[in-house]
C-alpha cells in the first residue's frame, strides 16, 4: 500500500493558513443576505441608548443577571413593554446542550472539541460551528457558549476534551473559524473562558501567577484573535484569579485589555458562580451575571443608591448587550424551535469524527483492515459496547441517537465474518476470544468531566486487559477513546493504535470507517502524549496543581511541546504527530523575505508517494534568535496547511507569515516587537519531525 509512484507535479500552489492569515479558498461568508439588512454597530448602539433611556430602574436591574425556571437553566427574560427579547443561553463546545432544572433536549453529539482540534482543519471548525449554532436556534436559544479556547496546559485538566489543544496558534486559527461559523447563522457566540482557566483543581479560588509575556503569548492570543478577527459578540470571564485578581473583576483583563486595547464592542458574561463582587465587577466591565443574580441583584441596587456605582455604568452594560442583539437580528425576532435534521447532521458528525482520528501506530501496515481476508474478529473492552458521545459537565449533550462500536464494526464486516463482542470485564473470556480470532480490537477510554482533574492513566483494569489480549493475539489493535493524553505501558506489545477521542453519536460508524479504510486517517495530535507522569508539570507541584491557594506558571513560554524540546525529553507521541495509510514527502523549501522588519513567504512541495489518496498537515515552526527578553522556546508553531493529495501527486504549499509571527511581547514597551536576528524556519509533519529548514534574517 505504500509503494512509491512516479510523482505528478501540480502547477497550482495551495495557499494555506499561516500567522494571522485566513484560509483563502472555500471560506463561508460571515454575512448572509439577511444579516446585511441588520443595523451597523453604530446604528444599533444609538437605538440601544434610546431604548435604555425609556427603562425604569427596576427593569434595568432585572436585566443584568440571569434567572432559571423549570425548563431552562439560564436566561434573561424579555421586557414585553419595550419589545426587548429574551436572551436564551445554550452551552455549546460539543453541541447544543441547553441544560435546565431537570430537563435537557437532545441534540447532535458532535465529536469532542479536542477531536476537532486534531483535524487541524479550520474549514471543518467553521462548519462544526455553523451546524451547532443551527441546532441552537432549533432548540430555541440565541447565544451559544462556545468555543472553549483555553490552552491545554496540563494533560490532567478535566476540560482538555473541551479545548483545542496546547498551542496558541493552532487554537487561534480554529477559534476564529468556529466563531465565524457560529455567527454566520445569527447566533451569538460566547467565547470562553477568559483567561487561563487551565485546571479544574481549585478552579474557583486558585491564584495563577503568570508573567506578562507568558500571558500575552500563550494564554491570550486565541482570545485576541476571536475579538479582532472573528469579531466575537460576547465573551465569558473565568473562575480563577490571575496575579491576585479574579478574572471577572479584573479591570486590567476586562477593561484595559479587552475593551480598550482590543477594541471589543460586545458584552461580557460571567461563568456560573464566577462573580465575587458587585462594585469591582461592574467597574471592571462585566455585563451579565450568570446563571442568576447574587452580586448583580439587590447588592447592585444598593451600590447605585449609595453612589458607589453610577447608574450610567448600568446603562452602558445594557447598551452593549442590546446593541449586539440588535446587530444579530434578535430584536423583533425570537428563535423558533424546529426539528433538527437528524440524518444530515448525523452524517456530518460521522465525517468530522473520522477526519479527527489520529493513527498513532501501524506496524506492518496492519491497518486498514481488509474485510475480504478476515474470517473472525474479537471486539473487546468497555468502550466496545457503547458510544463515547462526549465528556461530562456543562458541555454534555444528550445525543439524538448513538451508534455503538459493535454495530459500526459489524456493518463494515462481511455477513459471514464471525464477530465476538465482550466488554472485557472477564479478562479470561476476552483472552480466549482474542486467541480464537484473526483480529483483536480492544476499545478502551476514559471519562473526563468538568469539575475535576484526572490522572493520565487509563481507568483500572484497562491496561491489564490490553496486555493480556496482546499476548494472546499478535494482531491486536487498540482504539483509544480519551479526552486527553494517556500513558501506554503496553505500546511495544501491540502493532496498531488509533486515538479516536470522544467520537460523538456516530462513534461506531466513524471508527469503523477508519479501521476498514473507508476514510484514510489524517488527524494530528493537538497535545503532546508524555511517556511518564514525571514528564508533565505535575513533577513540580508548585506548577501543578499548586498548594490549594496558588499555582505558579514558572515554565513560562515552554508549554506543551516547547517544554519537551527545551528539556530534551522525548515524548511518547509529539505534538502534530499522526500517521496515514499514505506516505508523504516534503521538499524544496524556499523562504522569501516579506518586508524588512519581519514577514516571509514560506513555500515547499508536499508529495504523496503512495497508491492511495491521503491528507497531510504541513507544519511551519520558527526558532527565534536570542533576544533581551530571554528564555526563548526552542520552536513555535506559526503556520500549517492541510492538503489532500491523490496517489502520486505533489503540490506547492505557500504560507504567508506576517510581522506578528516574528514578534514577541515586550513588557518594557508594553507591546509587540519584532526580534532582530536570524530566525530558523522548520517545516515538517510534527514538532518532532521537521526535515526542511532555512533561515530568515530580520534587521
Each language-model region and where it sits:
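Intrinsic low-complexity/disordered segments
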Residues: 2-3, 28, 32
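Bacterial N-terminal signal peptides that target proteins for export
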Residues: 2-17
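Bacterial N-terminal signal peptides
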Residues: 15-25
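Glycoside hydrolase catalytic-domain context in secreted enzymes
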Residues: 30-665, 671-673, 678-688, 696
Amino acid at each position: 500500500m505504500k509503494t512509491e509512484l512516479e510523482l505528478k507535479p501540480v502547477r497550482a500552489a495551495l495557499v494555506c493558513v499561516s500567522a494571522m492569515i485566513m484560509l483563502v479558498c472555500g471560506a463561508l461568508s460571515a454575512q448572509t443576505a439577511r444579516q446585511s439588512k441588520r443595523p451597523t454597530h453604530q446604528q444599533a448602539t444609538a437605538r440601544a441608548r434610546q431604548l435604555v433611556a425609556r427603562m425604569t430602574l427596576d427593569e434595568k436591574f432585572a436585566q443584568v443577571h440571569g434567572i432559571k425556571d423549570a425548563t431552562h437553566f439560564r436566561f434573561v427574560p424579555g421586557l414585553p413593554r419595550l419589545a426587548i427579547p429574551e436572551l436564551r443561553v445554550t452551552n455549546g463546545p460539543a453541541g447544543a446542550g441547553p441544560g435546565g432544572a431537570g430537563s435537557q433536549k437532545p441534540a447532535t453529539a458532535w465529536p469532542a472539541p479536542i477531536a476537532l482540534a486534531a483535524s487541524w482543519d479550520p474549514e471543518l471548525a467553521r462548519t462544526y460551528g455553523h451546524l451547532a449554532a443551527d441546532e441552537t436556534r432549533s432548540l430555541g436559544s440565541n447565544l451559544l457558549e462556545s468555543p472553549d479556547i483555553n490552552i491545554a496546559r496540563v494533560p490532567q485538566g478535566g476540560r482538555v476534551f473541551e479545548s483545542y489543544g496546547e498551542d496558541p496558534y493552532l487554537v487561534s486559527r480554529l477559534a476564529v473559524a468556529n466563531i465565524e461559523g457560529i455567527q454566520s447563522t445569527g447566533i451569538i457566540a460566547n467565547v470562553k473562558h477568559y483567561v487561563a482557566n487551565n485546571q479544574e483543581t481549585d478552579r474557583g479560588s486558585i491564584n495563577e501567577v503568570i508573567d506578562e509575556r507568558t500571558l500575552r503569548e500563550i494564554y491570550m492570543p486565541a482570545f485576541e484573535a476571536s475579538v479582532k478577527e472573528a469579531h466575537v459578540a460576547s465573551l465569558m470571564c473565568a473562575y480563577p484569579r490571575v496575579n491576585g485578581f479574579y478574572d471577572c473583576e479584573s479591570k486590567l483583563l476586562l477593561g484595559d485589555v479587552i475593551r480598550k486595547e482590543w477594541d471589543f464592542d460586545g458584552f461580557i458574561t460571567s461563568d456560573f458562580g464566577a462573580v465575587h463582587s458587585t462594585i469591582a465587577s461592574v467597574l471592571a466591565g462585566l455585563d451579565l451575571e450568570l446563571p442568576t443574580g447574587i452580586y448583580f441583584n439587590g447588592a447592585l441596587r444598593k451600590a447605585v443608591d449609595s453612589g458607589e456605582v453610577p447608574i450610567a455604568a448600568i446603562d452602558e452594560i445594557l447598551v452593549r448587550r442590546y446593541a449586539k442583539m440588535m446587530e444579530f437580528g434578535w430584536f423583533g425576532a425570537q428563535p423558533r424551535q424546529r426539528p433538527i435534521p437528524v440524518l444530515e447532521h448525523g452524517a456530518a458528525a460521522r465525517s468530522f469524527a473520522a477526519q479527527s482520528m489520529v493513527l498513532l501506530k501501524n506496524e506492518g501496515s496492519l491497518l486498514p483492515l481488509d474485510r475480504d481476508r478476515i474470517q473472525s474478529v474479537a471486539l473487546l473492552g468497555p468502550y466496545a459496547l457503547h458510544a463515547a458521545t462526549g465528556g461530562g459537565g456543562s458541555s454534555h449533550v444528550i445525543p439524538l441517537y448513538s451508534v455503538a462500536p459493535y454495530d459500526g464494526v459489524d456493518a463494515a464486516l462481511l455477513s459471514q465474518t464471525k464477530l465476538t463482542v465482550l466488554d472485557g470485564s472477564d479478562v479470561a473470556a476476552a483472552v480466549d476470544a482474542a486467541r480464537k480470532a484473526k483480529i483483536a480490537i480492544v476499545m478502551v477510554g476514559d471519562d473526563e468531566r468538568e469539575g475535576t482533574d484526572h490522572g493520565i492513566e487509563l481507568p483500572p483494569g484497562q491496561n491489564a486487559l490490553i496486555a493480556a489480549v496482546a499476548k494472546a493475539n499478535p494482531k491486536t489493535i487498540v482504539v483509544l477513546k480519551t479526552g486527553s493524553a494517556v500513558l501506554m505501558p503496553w505500546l511495544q506489545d501491540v502493532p496498531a493504535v488509533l486515538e479516536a477521542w470522544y467520537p460523538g453519536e456516530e462513534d461506531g460508524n466513524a471508527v469503523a470507517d477508519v479501521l476498514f479504510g473507508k476514510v484514510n486517517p489524517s488527524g494530528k495530535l493537538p497535545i503532546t502524549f508524555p511517556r511518564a507522569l514525571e514528564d508533565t508539570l505535575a513533577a513540580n507541584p508548585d506548577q501543578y496543581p499548586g498548594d490549594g491557594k496558588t499555582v505558579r506558571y514558572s515554565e513560562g513560554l515552554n508549554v506543551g511541546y516547547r517544554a519537551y524540546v527545551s528539556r530534551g525529553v522525548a515524548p511518547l507521541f509529539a505534538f502534530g504527530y499522526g500517521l496515514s495509510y499514505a506516505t508523504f514527502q516534503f521538499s524544496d523549501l524556499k523562504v522569501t523575505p516579506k518586508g524588512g522588519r519581519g514577514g516571509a513567504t514560506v513555500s515547499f512541495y508536499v508529495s504523496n508517494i503512495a497508491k492511495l489518496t491521503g491528507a497531510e498537515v504541513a507544519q511551519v515552526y520558527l526558532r527565534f534568535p536570542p533576544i533581551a527578553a530571554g528564555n526563548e522556546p526552542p520552536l513555535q508553531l506559526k503556520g500549517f496547511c492541510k492538503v489532500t493529495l491523490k496517489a502520486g501527486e505533489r503540490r506547492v504549499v505557500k504560507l504567508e507569515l506576517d510581522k506578528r509571527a516574528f514578534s514577541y511581547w515586550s513588557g518594557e514597551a508594553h507591546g509587540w516587537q519584532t526580534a532582530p536576528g536570524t530566525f530558523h524556519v522548520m517545516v515538517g509533519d510534527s514538532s518532532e519531525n521537521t526535515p526542511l529548514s532555512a533561515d530568515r534574517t530580520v534587521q
